[in-house]
Amino acid sequence: MKRQKRDRLERAHSKGYQAGILGHPKDYCPYKTTVESRSQWLGGWREAMEDRAVTA
């Protein structure tokens, strides 16, 4: 049985979080055209920046 792909918005959030943890700027966002995906990516990025501030 094939595994189902994860939801695209969930994946965008996850990728944004990973980019934030690595310290990439928010201009690093690959989602320039789709507003929903960009919003999710930025949400993950912001969450990561908060987590970095707490642990730093």
Curated annotation (Swiss-Prot):
GO terms for cellular component: cytoplasm. Its main location: cytoplasm. It is found in: Cytoplasm. GO terms for biological process: regulation of translation. The keyword Cytoplasm applies. InterPro entries: Ribosome_modulation_factor, RMF_sf. Keywords: Cytoplasm, Translation regulation. Transmembrane segments: none annotated. During stationary phase, converts 70S ribosomes to an inactive dimeric form (100S ribosomes). Belongs to the ribosome modulation factor family. NCBIfam families: PRK14563.1, Rmf_CrpP_fam. This is Ribosome modulation factor. It comes from Serratia proteamaculans (strain 568). The gene is rmf.
